[in-house]
């Protein structure tokens, strides 16, 4: 499964932003902006709801693009399909 940090790094690079630029755009002080974004990209920190909203806005995506799991293995697809089917029967 693709992690939050991997998605964040991909979208940051796609938008041609440095870690410092992204960090400052979401409100981190210039001195620590790059370190904070690096922590999220390496999954050392988990962003709160407000930060997720800001990141999505700056990166030009819906918040769910950052938060919803991305399935990459056949077993993950099978499990997701199973639960979607089970939950739709209720």
Regions found by a protein language model. Give the residues of each.
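Short, charged recognition helix plus adjacent turn
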Residues: 57, 67-90
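Helix-turn-helix DNA-binding elements, focusing on the entry/boundary residues of the two helices
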Residues: 8, 19, 34, 49-52
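Recognition helix of helix-turn-helix/homeodomain-like DNA-binding domains
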Residues: 27-46, 68-69
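A detector for short, charged/polar N-terminal pre-domain segments
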Residues: 1-3
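DNA major-groove recognition helix of helix-turn-helix/homeodomain DNA-binding modules
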Residues: 25, 44, 48-65
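Short basic helix-loop element that most often maps to the first helix and adjoining turn
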Residues: 6-27, 82
């Amino acid at each position: 499964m693709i992690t939050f940090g991997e998605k964040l790094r991909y979208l940051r690079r796609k938008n041609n932003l440095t870690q410092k630029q992204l960090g400052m755009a979401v409100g981190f002080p210039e001195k620590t902006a790059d370190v904070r974004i690096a922590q999220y990209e390496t999954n050392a920190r988990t962003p709160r709801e407000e930060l997720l909203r800001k990141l999505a806005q700056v990166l030009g995506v819906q918040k769910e693009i950052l938060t919803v799991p991305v399935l990459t293995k056949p077993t993950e697809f099978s499990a997701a399909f199973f639960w979607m089917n089970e939950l739709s029967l209720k």
